[in-house]
Amino acid sequence: PGNTGYPNQCIFVFDPEFETYCDEMAQKLVANKMDKNIIGYFSDNELPFGPKNLEGYLTLQNPGDPGRVYAESWLKKQGITLQQITDEHREEFAGVVAERYYKVVSEAIRKYDPNHLYLGSRLHGKPKFIRQIVEAAGRYCDVVAINYYGAWTPSEKTMKHWGEWAQKPFIITEFYTKGMDSGLANTTGAGFTVQTQQERGYAYQHFVLGLLESGNCVGWHWFRYQDNDPTAKGADPSNLDSNKGLIDNEYNLYKPLADAMKELNINAYRLADWFDQQSNTNQ
C-alpha cells in the first residue's frame, strides 16, 4: 500500500491521543506559515479508507482498542448485528472514519498555518469512488487530491461525482505510463505500459485533456521525476524496475515525452477556456 500499514487497515482516528498527535505534528508547520512558495499540504498518502473498515475495527485483537469500541457502539446505534452488515453500512462507516480523520487533521493544520491550502490525503483505489469518503474530504479540504490509475481516459462520470460529492475542485497527484523502449523491465507499478517514449507523450496529452475538459480539475502531478533504480536497496515494491520518470537513471531527459508535455502545458489555460466554451454552448 501507499502507507506504512495499520492493524486490520484501521487508522487510529478514534484513539483519544489522535488529536494530540495531530496537533504535535502540525506544530512543525509554523515555520512555513509565511512561505509564499508553498501552495499547500498533503497530510498522508493513500490511507486505507474503505468498505473493509467496519469489519476491520470490529475484529481488532484488543477488545479495549478505542477503534473497536467505537465500531461496536456504532453498530449498536444502527440496530444491527455483525451478520446484518450490508455494503451500505460499510460505506457509511468508511465515511465516518474519513470524517473524523479530515476534521481533526484539517483543524490542526489550520491552527498552525492558516495561510496555505489543505490538499487532503491523496485518495486512491476504491476510496475515491465511495461517496461518503469524498464528501468527508470535501467538507474539510480546500482541494481533494486523487491518485488516479487504471484508466486510459479520465472518467467523465467519476470526475462529475467528485465535484458533486466534494463540492470542491480536485487535483490529480499521481498518474503515469511506462515505455518498453527504456530498457527497464516495467514489471512494477500501477501505470499502463506503452511501446515508446512518444506514446508516453501521447498518453499524457490524452489523459490531461480529459482532466481539463472536466472543468473541476485544478492540476496534475506526473509520477515521477526519475525512473526507478533497479539497484536501489529497500525500495517500495511498486518502485523497483519501471520507466516512470521524465529522466532516466543517468539523468538523461526522455525528450519525446517532455516535448509532448510542454506542448500541452503551455496551452493548458487556453484549452481549459475552449472546453468551457464548448460546455456552455452545449447547455
State each model region's role:
Residues 51-56, 156, 182-184, 232-234:
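Short, solvent-exposed loop/turn and secondary-structure capping segments
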Residues 1-33, 96-112, 117, 158-166, ...:
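Aromatic-lined substrate-binding rim segments of carbohydrate-active enzymes
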Residues 58-69, 223-283:
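Aromatic-rich peripheral "rim/lid" segments of glycoside hydrolase catalytic domains that contact
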